[in-house]
Amino acid sequence: MWYPPAAVVPFFESHSVTYEDRSAIAKWHFLPFDQRAVNEMTVLLNFLHISQGFHNETLYTDVRRRCMLMRSLFELVFANNYLELTNPKLLGWFLYLTAEDRTLIQNEGGLLSFLKKHPELGVTRQYVYVKAKPKGNYVPPPTTMASNDSRYPTFYGSSGCQNCGTSCPFGTKKCTRCGVHIVISQDKISVSENEKQLQLLPNSLKEELNVFQTSQSNVEMQNIHLGCTQSTLNTRSKQRSPEAHPHFYSKGMCSHAQCLSQLWQEVESREDAKHFKDTSAQASFCLDMELDVQSQVQRNDNTQNNQNQSYNPTEENDHNVDQETMPEYYSFSSISLDHTAWSNGSQSAETGFNDSITATKGSTELSDELSEAANSTAANSTDCFSCVSNSFELAEESGDCLDSRYEQQINKSNVGSSPKSKSSASVYVDQMIDACGDFRAFFTSTCATKTDQTFQVKNVATDTDLPAVSHEKDTQTMRMTTSDKNTITEVYMSDLDVLTEEFIKLKETEKGLKQMKSMNARRLCGCDCAQRVRKAELNLLALQFVMCQQHCWRRYFTSPLGESAYQGTEALPDSIAETLKTLQKDYHEMRQQILAGTPLDDLAPLSVNSEKISTGTNYSPSSVLAAHLDCAGSTIASDHKVDEEHTAMKVPPSEVCQDIETAPDEAKNECSKRDKALFILPKQTRISTEPKTVGANKDLNGSEAWFDAEEELGFPNQDGNMEKPNKMRETMRHKMETKGTDEDVSKQSSLLCITCLPGNITEHEVLLWFEKYNPTNVCISAFSNNTRAAIVYLKSYIDAKAAVEDLNGRSLQGHAVQVVHLSGTVSADLKPSDLSHSASESHKEDTAGDELRTKNLTYGSSHGGPRCSLERLTNVCNSPTASGTCVPQHYATMGSFDTIMARLSERHPNVARQRIVDALLELRAKHQGFLSGLPLRSIVDMTSELLTQTSSSARV
């Protein structure tokens, strides 16, 4: 039996190869496909040949395909030692199969079942690997088989017809079934990288090595010399994409280039090839190794000749298929090579010489057309020597009888040829033998340009070039791109530290995830409703706390104790301090209970007891809100009720001026309750409160750029809607006036409160100013902010009302004086001290109102929650906010504007205030936006002219 030559595959020794040079270090062992499986398949095919009557039936085709698939799969796994079942190479191999091949595998039970049924592959978990094989060459016992069944060889060394797909021996010109000529396109013959390396040789050396082809007939020999590596995959070459085939299945080249290319690839991947520093030394080593291999092959052939002298079958060229005898059948799937099995082939091929690798040594398996083609090209192929170097069995033996062996081979191959051909062949062999020294010299001088140890590594499965391997072994952290999972890395301490750190981070992350899951499990639902409800309850509790604080401050500053404390700088009394501390303590306790999970509805409402501050009961914001929601139209007093003024204005208590103390409803309150006076101060104009005395401080800004500030017509305690406070003020004033007309005039108060007085005015001057209204007494009081107010007592209520209508808003020594009628009954024996007290109380309502509201709102404007400090704070800002007193930007320069407005109001009492402001803006536009350089009298005169012109034009 003859076995086809073995494919040279690198065998890696994992116990002695490190990560860096694992893909570079290779020991070239001949690992044959298991011969027992080969023999079994041979017997099976012989039986099929006999039973099917030499025809290419479906069963025979399926078995052939199955064997071919097993062969291809074995080569893929063998090139990588082992593969994962999900490896892209294995999956790509399956996807590139034809539909018939995939159907065949699916009929076997799928790819996994097909792998398990493979005789040379094993499947463990998620990996497929090559089973252990004995190292070295396996020499099977010689077997003799004779049969008259089939003239077909096996799949290797055969090709398929392009018309009918019938398998024909490789090199056959005409199909034996349909008679169509088999054409092998020369354009598809690819040029390998090794041939490119051969092109670098000098022309003289190429001629000596006889690399060039001299005739067209050599193209046919190239197809014959493809050998077992071509195999039956050529029958599928036109059905698959080029990426599906390894490159070495489609290489076509001359026998010399094929031998040298394979030698080059073998030595380049060999273990000791790493020690060469340039390609010239590698080329020399290739030539030496080729000569050694040829020497060893010759010795093996001589040994086999002595043992098997009786085994010398001759080739018969019988064109009759029925009378053809079955030759020595050879294996169709073996990759091993036994040189003794066909040692007599070269001697017995005298009648039909064929030096192809796939030629059957000592058999007649080739067809007649193949024999004719070989005979026709024998004369032109005398320069070709036998390519037995495909075995590439590396040995350290020296070639002793190279000359005699080569001459003997040439003499055998040139039987029947002319003497001229013999002489040329002899010269060629001599040149091949003597070219060793010249080869080194030429190649060293032309190609020895690299000094680094860098060379290409071939992938056996796909015959593609892998990235250049660097053999430096400095550190393990060098990044090397690998697509296979067949490497074992050595672990160093630095890598262990990194892995430990990553493991700790992973554990911490898992711990955090577990905590988050436990927190989510505690929630009532999957959303954040519970957190939102808790946040809303905390905000509501904080609002109630602020309302209680405001209530305490309002009670305190409207009491006599708060009035005296406001005029001085003394500390807060113990009553208000203790009340606020108790409120603060209750607030924090309720907040902690809410955070612990107790709903706000289950807790007692937050309240404050203001009995220590002034007369009153317990105040609870929640009860006030509940009463307001239950009975929106009812009037509720300060003890948890809303007064009738609040109900009439339809605004909550927080929007009402906080310095107004409502009077109890007569229908709801008992007669024992104390009546309280309701002080209503109209909107005060923002004027300078500094006294105009000699040596007094002037305005901070002398430019009098009052025109840059717009007039603020809104309520001083609000920053939004300005119409609502005006309506509220008018409604309350109308009620007081109506109430005054219904009661007895004699019982009404005749007290007037005059504010915004100049700093140098005296009581006598005030009496003279109210002379026509019958004043009886005047009391002037000065406050800590240099503000002065006077209380004027008139004889009758009618005089007081007339004085308010005539003198309110008039200018007194350059100041716009505000005159307010104090409501309520006044006893006849009113003393000056009482008048002073009333004046202080009335002026306190106006001047200290802003500061009181500032204190109250300061506690509610803290970003971190309600302010717990009990000190008197003042929050002054440049822009209006809901939590602070708004100080206009040009507050210190508004004195001149107030003076101009007062004088224009005196000259034009029937003109509205907004019309005067429009006239001033028009005057400023005429002077290009600057009025600061003009005296105030000139500005008043020019504005008055504009108002007069506008009035006259409106009348016309």
UniProtKB/Swiss-Prot annotation:
Q: Which GO terms describe its molecular function?
A: protein homodimerization activity; RNA binding
Composition-biased stretches, type Basic and acidic residues, lie in: 840-854
Keyword entries, A-Z: Cytoplasm, RNA-binding
Which cysteines in this chain are paired by disulphide bridges?
none
Pfam family for this entry, one? RRM_1
Using the UniProt annotation, give all residue ranges assigned to the region (Disordered).
Answer: 301-321, 831-855
Its subcellular locations are:
Cytoplasm
Segments forming domain RRM: 750-824
Assigned GO CC terms: cytoplasm; intercellular bridge
What InterPro entries does the entry give? Nucleotide-bd_a/b_plait_sf, RBD_domain_sf, RRM_dom
> Where is it chiefly localized?
cytoplasm
- What's this protein's function? Component of intercellular bridges during meiosis. Intercellular bridges are evolutionarily conserved structures that connect differentiating germ cells. Not required for fertility.
The protein's name in its UniProt record: RNA-binding protein 44
- What is the native source organism of this protein? Danio rerio (Zebrafish)
Instruction: Identify the gene encoding this protein.
Output: rbm44
